[in-house]
């Protein structure tokens, strides 16, 4: 395969950023891409620090791991596999699964000086990102989460997550129909934090918003969107028009979920300011 490597070193950095672009060889070559099981086994065999996991394997990779983090277990999805180390810092071949999506969302808010413990939240969506955000928030001290979604095939998944949160955390969670706009407006006016964790706002839905108009936002509501392209969605523009001052896109979540994964792999911090500079945030 062909590989391009860019390296930036700095004595200020605990970890040097190394970026690799790799053209994956065909499945018929020696590296075992043929099954998820063999790929996971290769983490052990090659003594890798870990791996990121993408769809559709996030919900099934747990079968081949030794441990699963509590949040990943509750939300039913793993995006990071770590080869655990012994007291000497050597990888052991014992693999643990995490979900850093939720961690990244809440870390991004913390970096903005927001203490979310005890907050009331309105969350739109029941997909992988929404589920990870809800579960991590519930475990880390969010008081109430009102989840809204259209009544599609994912609605029942939202009901399952609400049940798990209520049974396993001190957070009170409720599932609601997104079609009930009066209820949505009522809950948003009573909330401290709002998050749209759907794909509405990104291509090809960049001209749409789940929120009918700016009157749904109150000025002191913290508004977040998991979409990062475009940098400003229609929903974010509505919030700013309503006078909201704390409005954030998904770039912070994307950055910090990756940095948390790297920390889990290496035990080292990454140059956050440099990464923010390169991402333009």
Region spans (language model):
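Conserved S-adenosyl-L-methionine
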Residues: 139-144, 242-245
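Glycine-rich adenosine-cofactor-binding loop
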Residues: 99-102, 118-138
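Adenosine-phosphate binding glycine-rich loop
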Residues: 221-222, 226-281
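Short, small-residue-biased leader/transition segments that mark boundaries at the very start
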Residues: 1, 21-25, 29-36
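Rossmann-like adenosine-cofactor binding region
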Residues: 171-247
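Phosphate/diphosphate ligand-binding glycine-rich loop within oxidoreductases
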Residues: 8, 32-112
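NAD(P)-binding Rossmann-fold cofactor-contacting core
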Residues: 142-169
């Amino acid at each position: 395969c062909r590989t391009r490597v860019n390296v930036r070193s700095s004595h200020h950095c605990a970890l040097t950023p190394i970026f690799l672009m790799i053209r994956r060889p065909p499945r018929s070559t020696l590296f075992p891409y043929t099954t998820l099981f063999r790929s996971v086994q290769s983490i052990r065999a090659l003594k890798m620090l870990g791996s990121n996991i993408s769809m559709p394997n996030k919900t099934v990779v747990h079968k081949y791991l030794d441990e699963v983090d509590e949040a990943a277990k509750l939300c039913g999805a793993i995006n990071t596999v770590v080869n655990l180390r012994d007291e000497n810092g050597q990888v052991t071949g014992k693999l643990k699964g995490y979900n850093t999506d939720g961690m990244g969302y809440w870390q991004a808010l913390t970096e903005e000086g927001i203490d979310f413990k005890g907050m009331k939240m309105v969350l739109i969506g029941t997909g992988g990102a929404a589920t990870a955000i809800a579960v991590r928030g519930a475990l880390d001290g969010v008081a109430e989460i009102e989840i809204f979604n259209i009544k599609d095939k994912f609605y029942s998944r939202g009901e399952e997550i609400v049940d798990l949160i209520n049974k396993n955390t001190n957070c009170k969670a409720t599932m609601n129909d997104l079609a009930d706009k009066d209820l949505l407006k009522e809950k948003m006016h009573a909330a401290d934090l709002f998050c749209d964790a759907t794909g509405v706002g990104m291509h090809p839905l960049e001209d749409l918003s789940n929120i009918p108009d700016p009157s749904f936002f109150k000025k002191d509501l913290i508004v977040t969107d998991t979409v990062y392209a475009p940098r400003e969605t229609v929903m974010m523009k509505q919030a700013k028009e309503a006078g909201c001052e704390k409005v954030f896109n998904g770039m912070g979540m994307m950055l910090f979920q990756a940095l948390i994964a790297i920390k889990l792999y290496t035990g080292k911090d990454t140059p956050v300011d440099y990464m923010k500079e390169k991402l333009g945030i």
